[in-house]
Amino acid sequence: MHLEAARVIFFLWIFLQVQGIKDLSIKIYGSEIKDIDNAPRTEATKNTAKTYKVSTMRRIFDLAKHRTKRSAFFPTGVKVCPQESMEQILASLQAYYRLRVCQEAVWEAYRIFLDRLPEPGEYQDWVSVCQQETFCLFDIGKNFSNSQEHLDLLQQRMKQRNFLERKDEVVTKETLGELGQTPGLQQTLPVSHPGPCLSLPMTTAQRNPQLHPSRTPRVPTRERKIEFTDAAEDALEQKVELSISLANQKFKSELDNSQSPYYLEVAAKSQLQMQKIFKKLPGFKEIHVSGFRPKKERDGTSSTEMQLTAIFKKGKAEAKSPASDPLSLDSNKIESEGDPRGTTEEEKQRELYPTASELRKLISRALEEDQSLDVGTIQFTDEIVGSLPSLDPDTQLVLPTLLTDITKDATLSPELPLGQPRLETVDRAGHSPPGASPTDGWSPPAMTSTSLSETLPFFTASSVFPQTDQSATDIMSIDQTVLIPRLTVPTDDYSAISPLVPEISHLPTSSEDWLSTSSQDTMEYLDGVDLTKTPTSSEGPRNSVGMFPAWIIFLENITPDPGLRYITTSAMTVAARGRELVVFFSLRVANVPFSTDLFNKSSLEYQALEQRFTQLLVPNLRSNLTGFKQLEILNFRNGSVIVNSKVRFAKSVPYNLTKAVRGVLEDFRSTAAQQLDLEIDSYSLDVEPADQADPCKFLACGEFAQCVRNEWTEEAECRCRSGTQALVLPIEDCEDIPGKGTPCRSLDQSKNQVYEPGVKKFQRQQDNKVTMKRKFELLTIGYEEFNYQDWEGN
């Protein structure tokens, strides 16, 4: 009994001890959470809490040991590789920090002081200077605030505010200031030179040049001493003076007085409206309204002609910089890497600012496309030598020296209607046609089948073109063939015209100048002349030699129209005269064998391969290139398989067209090699814009045919050589029929060698057209289903 009582007491004591320790642990842990900073702890409490924490950290550490080890990425975008040392990591972070700070500083300077986006070249210059610590950050802002562009911008804003607030007051000419001057800012403005920057300790990148190669500091090309002089302005700017007629705006007498409130109100509104149109043009700075004057239209009504002066930036040859490569504002690159497909220095300079002729084309196109203005005619002042205002509608221009610069190679044919210009081959080397001596006069037939009316439309803005020195003007380049449309000259007094043609002893030897300035300006106006609407007249012969319509001036310097030239910058590509952009490209597929059926566009193999490349290329071009319109597979050539194609785009695109197409094709080549089992030779990629490409290079003609290029339309076509004739017309649609030779055959072949009678051949052509139409409809339906499935899959 006594033993059992002792055992019970022993177990009870053990139970109480265990329970007390447990309560003590809970109390210590609770007090630690509540009073972790203020409550005093005993040594036992500290040891217990430490044991508890260590065990928790050990459990977390044990779990972390089972995770996969990977490289650390900083949220800034700098990747830290495991093999880098601590000094290299710090150097990379510091360099990236300096780059981002400089990018933001320069970007904000352009946005705040100049209110525009920077050009890639100047942006890179300033970022490089900032990274090299040539300027302190705040000195960059001081330089921008004292720049001429910023002061001109302030002057422009002040003028706009004065026009709106004080339009009811009479403002003197001295208050407004003369055009090109800055009132109140004529004195030389002191520019604060950069003070001594705080010398930072030498970083790891400076101690180790191999980690971060140093660059030579390039100070941006900016005026240190700003003076508003004509010389400095002419060196940095170019002015374009033009006048536009507003057909629906009647002229009021108040517009004659430049100090009247009505004049100031109209000028302010017109200036703001023109700024909205012109700000889209590259290099535009400002525009001013020079004045208004009345103009009498051809129908007798009166309209208003507004004179404008637009100021653009002008690129200089010495402003070229090796750092003019475009820089992405979100780029993480610390060092500039050269682009293996980069443009040359000349191309970079050409991409900065357009030339004077390109500006005129851009301005004309922008005004014509704007719907807010009813623009009648556009005339540039620098193109006018003499002005004949207020012409009577029935009065025609008298140009006594109109045909002074006609070359001997220009052939005038009286036998072709004006609506169908004939293509004539002309030798640029200066040789006379066979059977004609250099001194022979022009002796056309006595009667002409088509004549011109005396009331033909001519240019609204009249011009007088003086006779120019033949030796000082490059008319044509040598050793090239151009195509000239024949025209009918409406006169019977041929003896009077013949003495007007000067004798040309030589032609220019330059093969680079395609045209002279006068012909370039003239052809811009010919774009708006519709020769097919020319009326015919049966009136008698004319008495005056000079009574020719003004569009005949294109016979002066008969060089082909250069209107297809594209205006290309780093941020846009624009086709001149409102045409669509065209790019030719070719690529070679190495692992596809070539067969003779690919010469025949009607063969199933040709159509299948054409459909395959169309389905592969069109989605890539459409999704990656804004303004894409059409892809045309021109032909397949031997050499494994060489695919020649033509891509059509809109009139203007917001990127460099050639670079963008090449980039898309490079991506397509990589994708085709990985997913489609197509080995495209990277060295075979050839991308050429239509204004620089030779269309005959991408057009395959037959053995007895030759490629002929129309210099006006920039289109190429196959034509039979002399002594041959076409089997099927048009020749460009002919195919090599297996077993039946080439599309053209010699004329000396016997009639027994004719392949088919005329009736059967015509019937076969019609059957082929119907078959091709059905196949094309089936291919179109299949291609639409393919696009729909591809869209749903995405």
Swiss-Prot record:
Chondroitin sulfate-, heparin- and hyaluronan-binding protein. May serve to form a basic macromolecular scaffold comprising the insoluble interphotoreceptor matrix. GO terms for biological process: visual perception. SUPFAM superfamilies: SEA domain. Glycans are attached at T425, T439, S443, T448, T450, N624, N656. It comes from the Eukaryota. Residues 332-351 have a biased composition (Basic and acidic residues). A motif (Heparin- and hyaluronan-binding) lies at residues 629-637. Residues 202-221, 314-355, 413-449 are annotated as: Disordered. One of its GO terms (molecular function) is hyaluronic acid binding. Residues 202-213 have a biased composition (Polar residues). SMART domains: SEA (SM00200). It comes from Bos taurus. Coiled coil: none annotated. This is Interphotoreceptor matrix proteoglycan 1. InterPro entries: IMPG, SEA_dom, SEA_dom_sf. The keyword Cell membrane does not apply. One of its GO terms (cellular component) is photoreceptor inner segment. It is found in: Cell projection, Cilium, Photoreceptor outer segment; Secreted, Extracellular space, Extracellular matrix, Interphotoreceptor matrix; Photoreceptor inner segment. Residues 1-20 form the signal peptide. Highly glycosylated (N- and O-linked carbohydrates and sialic acid). Keywords: Cell projection, Extracellular matrix, Glycoprotein, Heparin-binding, Hyaluronic acid, Receptor, Repeat, Secreted, Sialic acid, Signal. PANTHER family: INTERPHOTORECEPTOR MATRIX PROTEOGLYCAN, INTERPHOTORECEPTOR MATRIX PROTEOGLYCAN 1. The keyword Repeat applies. Residues 236-357, 579-692 form the SEA domain.
